[in-house]
């Protein structure tokens, strides 16, 4: 029994040795075993389990089998080195702007973001932005702003850096409402005038400038004019003009004045493309946000106010439309608010639980939770929202309805009437009057449209018209007066008393005809014939020679040739029409003098008539006095003025006028050739 156990122990020991040798030969290619496996292997070895028995047992005489040779190791695998690119192209970085690969030192890193561009592209980009007065510089690839220190480091140009700093200063000062820049050319001096509204005269303190300008209109000081008058005087010089072959300048095209306006803060001119864009504009120079229609700095609620400005329209609402909208809002506000509240309450009571249930269900949908827990959470949320939704609806309606009513009946009417848009005025003890007419001042755009199609006719009667007035003094003459303060350049022709006082009122003629033909060197012209009836020595009428161009500065006036032919037909037996020479303009009219035995009495009573065309500078008549004289004259377009019996003679002069009338009637058959024809050939008017 003992021998059998010794043989079994030796056999197991030999097998274990062979197994360990095999592991040693195979372990060179495998990682070493973990310490736990080695410990288990040592514990399972039989000599360690039975140390005493192995020593006492004699060694067997049976030789152990030779160990098997280990397998040859696998040949080493050579890993080829990575191929090196020629010229070191791995160190080059591609610029995202010009797509050129450049070394890293030519592509700096921006401090505000991680985008990188080459120095050449960055300098060109900054140069373009600064030259166009855009100092809010950003990264070319994103909206991150560039710091001034980084801009200076990239530019390395003293002149461009100075311009950039000047534009930065101007942008900061433009936000100050009391900052005023000197209007003199090449003067960059600014005056910060606090509390100078009552004393608007400012003086530039720069040495060598000393320009005086106005605090309100920010232009050169106008001592004898208001800001509106000075603005109207400067308005024609702002428009771009084109020359007509006749020498008259008109606007370039229709609507060009509406496409170009100046910023209300920095006065930089801005052109708006007619592409259907909105009216909310942002100045790229100073960053001012303003409305293109009213040209005022606005907020986000401007287009919701009753100002009449629309977000997409091309012009603001008229006063009539604003008043109608206001009245309809006041009347329909209770109905509309009640309807909104009636719809909002059930919508909130039903919609809030549905919204809460869907949100809770969507949150638990992607999570591995039990079905019962999910249903419990959704049910609890819906029950709580059903309880809270009526309270939320009541609070919302209770707060929202009073706010809407206060806005409709309080804020809207006050803001509308404060801006003068409601047109409600109180008459002198006659109650409240609502004015629907637009009586605003004439803008540059309106004057520009009026310049496009100048005409001679009925449309020109709206401005200062030519007035042919007569007086009883025989020394009065025919003169031309040019209006300086009217919207359209017009001429006032004053006929002397030699026509009415010396000839017509003398009882030798019942009427005379004045035919005016004006030629402004245009393709078409209009001819008007008017008749003058004499009642008294101061009879006057109003005739328009034509609206030529709108009022502009005298130094910008051009020379236009106007040909006026005046045909004066009268019935006296004899009269003489003489002329006096002037410096530049001449008016000469002559009539043949025919003597007869029957007209000897008439010839003694008719005095010589002189008609003189004076220079425009020689007449300084007031516009109001000219209009006052012309208000008493009837319309000239009527054909009834051609009749000799247009105005009934007064009873006191009836007996005095009838004998000469019979005398002239007898002379018609004998002296038909005595009708005079006077022509004013060419009058050169300096406009």
From Swiss-Prot:
The active site is at 278. Zn(2+) 5 binds at residues 291, 294, 302, 309. It is a multi-pass membrane protein. The chain crosses the membrane at residues 330-350, 391-411. A zinc finger (IBR-type) spans 161-227. Residues 629-641 have a biased composition (Acidic residues). Residues 53-88, 618-662 are annotated as: Disordered. Zn(2+) 3 binds at residues 214, 217, 222, 227. Zn(2+) 1 binds at residues 95, 98, 118, 121. Zn(2+) 2 binds at residues 182, 187, 204, 209. GO terms for biological process: protein ubiquitination; ubiquitin-dependent protein catabolic process. The keyword Endoplasmic reticulum applies. It is found in: Cytoplasmic granule membrane; Endoplasmic reticulum membrane. It is an enzyme of class 2 (transferase). InterPro entries: E3_UB_ligase_RBR, IBR_dom, TRIAD_supradom, Znf_RING, Znf_RING/FYVE/PHD. It comes from the Eukaryota. The first IBR-type zinc finger is the most crucial for interaction with UBE2L3, UBE2L6 and UCKL1. Interacts with UBE2L3, UBE2L6 and UCKL1. E3 ubiquitin-protein ligase which accepts ubiquitin from E2 ubiquitin-conjugating enzymes UBE2L3 and UBE2L6 in the form of a thioester and then directly transfers the ubiquitin to targeted substrates, such as UCKL1. Involved in the cytolytic activity of natural killer cells and cytotoxic T-cells. Protects against staurosporin-induced cell death. Belongs to the RBR family. RNF19 subfamily. This is E3 ubiquitin-protein ligase RNF19B. It comes from Xenopus laevis.
């Amino acid at each position: 029994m003992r021998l059998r156990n010794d043989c079994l122990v030796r056999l197991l020991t030999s097998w274990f040795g062979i197994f360990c040798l095999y592991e040693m030969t195979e372990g060179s290619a495998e990682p070493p075993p973990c310490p736990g496996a080695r410990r288990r292997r040592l514990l399972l070895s039989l000599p360690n389990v039975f140390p005493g028995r192995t020593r006492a047992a004699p060694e067997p005489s049976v030789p152990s089998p030779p160990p098997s040779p280990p397998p040859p190791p696998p040949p080493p695998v050579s890993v080829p080195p990575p191929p090196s690119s020629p010229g070191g192209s791995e160190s080059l970085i591609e610029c995202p702007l010009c797509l050129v690969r450049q070394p890293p030192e030519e592509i700096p890193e921006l401090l505000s973001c991680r985008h990188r561009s080459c120095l050449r592209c960055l300098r060109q980009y900054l140069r373009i932005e600064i030259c166009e007065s855009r100092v809010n510089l950003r990264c070319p690839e994103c909206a991150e702003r560039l710091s001034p220190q980084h801009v200076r480091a990239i530019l390395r140009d003293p002149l461009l850096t100075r311009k950039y700093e000047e534009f930065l200063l101007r942008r900061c000062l433009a936000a100050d409402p009391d900052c005023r820049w000197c209007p003199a050319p090449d003067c960059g001096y600014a005056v910060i005038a606090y509390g100078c509204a009552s004393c608007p005269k400012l003086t530039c303190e720069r040495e060598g400038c000393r320009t005086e300008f106005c605090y309100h209109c920010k232009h050169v000081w106008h001592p004898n004019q208001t800001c509106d008058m000075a603005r109207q005087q400067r308005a024609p010089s702002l428009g771009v003009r084109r020359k007509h072959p006749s020498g008259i300048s008109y606007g370039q095209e229709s609507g060009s004045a509406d496409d170009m306006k100046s910023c209300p803060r920095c006065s930089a001119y801005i052109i708006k493309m007619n592409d259907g864009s909105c009216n909310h504009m942002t100045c790229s120079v100073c960053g001012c946000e303003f409305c293109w229609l009213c040209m005022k700095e606005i907020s986000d609620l401007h287009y919701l106010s009753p100002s009449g400005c629309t977000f997409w329209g091309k012009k603001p609402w008229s006063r009539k439309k604003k008043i109608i909208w206001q009245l309809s809002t006041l009347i329909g506000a209770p109905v509309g608010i009640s309807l909104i509240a009636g719809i909002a309450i059930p919508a909130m009571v039903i919609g809030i639980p549905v919204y809460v249930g869907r949100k809770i269900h969507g949150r638990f949908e992607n999570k591995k939770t039990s079905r019962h827990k999910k249903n419990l959470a959704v049910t609890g949320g819906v029950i709580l929202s059903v309880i809270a939704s009526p309270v939320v609806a009541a609070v919302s309606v209770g707060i929202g309805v009073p706010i809407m009513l206060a806005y409709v009946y309080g804020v809207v009417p006050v803001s509308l009437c404060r801006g003068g848009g409601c047109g409600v005025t109180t008459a002198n003890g006659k109650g409240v009057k609502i004015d629907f007419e637009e009586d605003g001042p004439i803008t540059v755009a309106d004057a520009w449209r009026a310049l496009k199609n100048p005409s001679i006719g009925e449309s020109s009667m709206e401005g200062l018209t030519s007035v042919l007035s007569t007086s009883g003094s025989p020394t009065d003459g025919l003169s031309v007066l040019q209006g300086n303060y009217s919207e359209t350049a017009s001429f006032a022709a004053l006929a002397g008393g030699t026509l009415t006082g010396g000839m017509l009122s003398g009882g030798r003629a019942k009427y005379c005809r004045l035919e005016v033909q004006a030629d402004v060197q245009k393709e078409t012209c209009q001819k008007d014939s008017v008749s003058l009836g004499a009642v008294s020595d101061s009879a006057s009428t109003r005739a328009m020679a034509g609206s030529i161009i709108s009022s502009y500065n005298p130094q910008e006036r051009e020379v236009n040739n106007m040909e006026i032919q005046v045909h004066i037909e009268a019935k006296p037996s004899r009269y003489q029409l003489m002329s006096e020479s002037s410096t530049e303009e001449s008016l000469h009219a002559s009539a043949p003098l025919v003597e007869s035995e029957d007209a000897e009495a008439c010839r003694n009573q008719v005095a010589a008539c002189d008609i003189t065309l004076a220079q425009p500078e020689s007449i300084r008549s007031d516009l109001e006095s000219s209009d006052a004289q012309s208000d008493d004259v009837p319309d000239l377009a009527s054909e009834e003025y051609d009749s000799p019996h247009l105005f009934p003679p007064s009873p006191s002069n009836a007996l005095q006028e009838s004998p000469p009338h019979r005398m002239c009637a007898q002379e018609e058959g004998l002296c038909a050739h005595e009708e005079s024809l006077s022509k004013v050939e060419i009058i050169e008017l300096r406009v």
